[in-house]
Amino acid sequence: MSIIDIANNILRKYCLCDRCLGRLFASLGRGLSNDERGKAIKIALVLELHKRYLDGDKDSLKQLVELSPNIGPIAVNLIKNLGIEIEYTPRTCFICDNKINDIIDTYSQRIADIINERHINSFVLGIRGVTSYIRKEESIANEFKLLYWENIKRELKREIGKKIQMMTNAKVDFLNPEAMIIIDIDRDRIYIESPSLLIYGRYWKLGRMISQNIWLTKNGVKKYPLSIEEIAKMLVKDGFGDDVVLHIAGREDVDVRTLGSGRPFVLEIKRPRKRNIDIKDIENRLNSISRWLKFELNMFVDRDFVSRVKKGCRTSYKIYRAIVVADRDIGIEDIKRLEEFFRDRIIEQRTPTRVLRRKKDVLRRRKVFEIKTRVISPRVFEALIKCEGGLYVKELISGDNGRTVPSFSSVLNANTLCLTLDALYVHEYI
């Protein structure tokens, strides 16, 4: 059966707009929109019936008159030109109720306005809803055993996407879009999910009693006056995005400063309001909030980079500076013995007593590569400690009542405590 015969049978029963008719034959022909395809099929059908009428088939004219309300003006105008008066009342499309063009135009404009406002450079489109339209077109496809039709959602995605690209500088990108746009036609809603902006950088803690995360007591009061997370979340108030998350290479205690090379981290801005932001604007904003924290932002990264940063902290080495106090005088021989003993030494640590309430009691093995020491006073000395990531340095010094072995205390046969601790270098494997 020819396309014209199939279209004839369909239009005898259903009024269809050009787009919805063309969509039933969407896989036939190249370079045509469904609107053009449907109009061409209607014209071809009208021409064929007119030809048959001119060839003497009087039933063809009757057939054309019967079809005209479902075909539309193309058929009606021909019938009138043949001198036949007919009453014509436009009918609505059985599938889309004559709404599909309005849907395409309206949502294209709304989304284009959003894209221009947010400076989005690439997007991918999805459609929800239109279930009643889908049900109707599926019933026609099944009734007439159509093989070349396409779903209305597919046409809406394609046509709205094309118009958006014409109205903006944004392009469709299926692999790495800056925005995922979902149109819920039944609810008349547009949802825009922008993939997070991920920015790699480093931070420095120039003071003590600064936590990485906001730490609240049971009463909801901040336990520490300042946190890195708190500073980062200022970006939400400034309108950079809906939320901010920090992915940090390891952590240090609140009373430990981070100096030297700083600590690597990735700043994640969720659902960013704009994509083409200047990293230095964010860096300047972060650095303007507290003189006790310094940030340096270097580059945009992908999600895989975040994993490498977090994984690298477990395999990298770190250098700390500790000020240590002992309960007896420490001489030059003690210092030499300490340095020699902790050269490439494996340390066994059970979870420190001070964190047992929130961490599982497990045995960890970490390596101390070397230490360098300098006597400050008879019972106070400075130690530079190069060690594997994940080592509890305070417990390396104190021994934690035998939970860390060996320790400074066990080697020196003295009670030693860490007075202050600074992280000087965090090596990266990324």
Swiss-Prot record:
Binding residues for substrate, per the UniProt record?
320, 392
Keywords attached to this Swiss-Prot or TrEMBL record, sorted alphabetically, are: Isomerase, RNA-binding, tRNA processing
Question: Which enzyme type, at the first EC level?
Answer: isomerase
Which one Pfam family would you cite for this protein? Pus10_C
- The keyword tRNA processing belongs to this UniProt entry's keyword annotation: yes
Which segments cross the bilayer? none
In which domain of life is the source organism classified?
Archaea
Give the EC number. Answer: 5.4.99.25
Catalytic activity annotation = uridine(54) in tRNA = pseudouridine(54) in tRNA; uridine(55) in tRNA = pseudouridine(55) in tRNA
Query: Quick one: a GO biological-process term for this protein?
Result: tRNA pseudouridine synthesis
List of catalytic residues? 253
Q: Give one GO term, molecular function aspect.
A: tRNA binding
Purpose of the protein: Responsible for synthesis of pseudouridine from uracil-54 and uracil-55 in the psi GC loop of transfer RNAs.
- Sequence similarity: Belongs to the pseudouridine synthase Pus10 family.
NCBIfam families per the UniProt record, alphabetical: pseudo_Pus10arc (TIGR01213)
Q: Which HAMAP family match?
A: Pus10_arch
Under what name is this protein listed? tRNA pseudouridine synthase Pus10
Biological source species: Ignisphaera aggregans (strain DSM 17230 / JCM 13409 / AQ1.S1)
